[in-house]
Amino acid sequence: ACSFSDETYHYYDIKKAPFKIEGLAWFSKEKEYFRLPKDCQQDVSEAVYWLASHPAGGQLHFQSNSKTIVIKVQLAASANMTHMTGVGQAGFDLYYKKRNEKNYHFFTSTNYPYGQVEYSIVLYRNDKKEWKDFLIHFPLYMGVKNVWLGLEKDALLKPARKRKKQGKVVVYGTSITQGGCATRPGMAYTNILSRQLDIEFIN
């Protein structure tokens, strides 16, 4: 069921089924956009805990036939990096593929006013209603409080199809592994490999 509506769209909380969040190892248990357990603060440094609040590698998967998809976001803070794009630090980007296709296609990213901590923007638009697999990448260097997706009121929504490869690939590394300084989230190398190999990566 949708969380709320306006004149055009039903908005859905992506933490709830049928949406599937991948890339965040503790999400299924804690329902937080966080890369470590929330109660690990006493076991790691302040810097590590802060970086864990950035959901780099987080991916949202689902199927829909909506002609338009709107994303509504509440961030932990505004984008502020001088060496990285605002969309790479604090934005989302969307990929799609048709049911008979193997590879994802990039559509667009959230090019919003980067001083804002809340925004709503059209992330996908199509002239005709057709079923597609959708993949949305999370920000690389910014905490995320809440995300809702707006779909057309007559659109249908289904769980993501199973990946060809089961299991997970865990990657540990430097700021480059987290995604610095990719221009947008989908260009972080772990996200590229996840799409190409069709397997979940834990960043």
Go through the PLM ranges and name each one.
Residues 190-202:
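Short helix-loop-beta junction
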Residues 1-168:
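N-terminal secretory targeting modules
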Residues 166-190:
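Catalytic nucleophile-elbow at a beta strand-turn-alpha helix junction centered on a G-D-S/GDSL motif
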